């Protein structure tokens, strides 16, 4: 078996090896991104299973809620734990909502998590930023609780005709 190489095949062979060497960093970066996505999807699936377990238990299991609230509490303490002074709702509430959006997008879940986080930080208000975080969570709950009540009312009572008007 003889192999004949001409100038064109050597050039194409060299360019393909160069292409492989330039593609290897991109492939490893893509692999890293894929692994990160799989881990985050796994975390999302785990959170979803925990939420289903929480809602399926009667009465709701507070140990499961504590497991769900722990990463949110840590993220909120990392983000707002050192703040002092008054809460500026126009700036602080969107930041709080963006942190909460990373964990859960449903209002009822956010409500449960925020109440659990608030319960967990109330006894330990000796730290610097905890009164600030507590006030920020209270301001968000003042918006979230009525909003969730309105949505719940619309979902459960929309089939009934309003005879008063």
Swiss-Prot record:
Other comments on record: Fusion of YopR, an early secretion substrate, to the N-terminus of dihydrofolate reductase (DHFR), GST or other tightly folded proteins generates impassable hybrids that cannot travel the type III pathway and block the secretion machine. This blockade may be caused by binding of YopR hybrids to YscN/SctN, the ATPase that is involved in substrate recognition and in generating energy for type III secretion reactions. When expressed during type III machine assembly, YopR-DHFR blocks all secretion.
Family named by the database record: Belongs to the YopR family.
InterPro entries noted in UniProt: T3SS_YopR, YopR_core
GO cellular component assignments: extracellular region; type III protein secretion system complex
Organism superkingdom: Bacteria
Impact noted for substituting residue 146 to I: Not secreted in the presence of calcium or when yersiniae infected HeLa tissue culture cells
GO biological process, one term: protein secretion by the type III secretion system
Function: May be involved in the regulation of the assembly of the type III secretion system (T3SS), also called injectisome, which is used to inject bacterial effector proteins into eukaryotic host cells. May control the secretion and/or polymerization of YscF/SctF, the principal component of the needle filament, thereby impacting the assembly of the T3SS. Involved in pathogenesis. Essential for the establishment of Yersinia infections in a mouse model system.
Keywords: Plasmid, Secreted, Virulence
Compartments where found: Secreted
Induction: At 37 degrees Celsius in the absence of calcium.
Annotated SUPFAM superfamilies: Type III secretion system domain
Ranges for region 3' secretion signal: 131-149
Gene knockout outcome: Mutant displays reduced virulence in a mouse model system. It displays a reduced ability to inject effectors into macrophages and requires lower calcium concentrations to activate type III secretion than wild-type yersiniae. Mutants secrete YscF into the extracellular medium but do not assemble needle complexes on the bacterial surface. Disruption mutant still requires Ca(2+) for growth and can secrete the Yop proteins, with the exception of YopR. Mutation does not abolish type III targeting or secretion.
TM regions (residue ranges): none
Gene name as annotated: yscH
Lineage: Bacteria, Pseudomonadati, Pseudomonadota, Gammaproteobacteria, Enterobacterales
Chief site of localization: secreted
Official protein name in the record: Type 3 secretion system regulator YopR
Region span, 5' secretion signal: 2-11
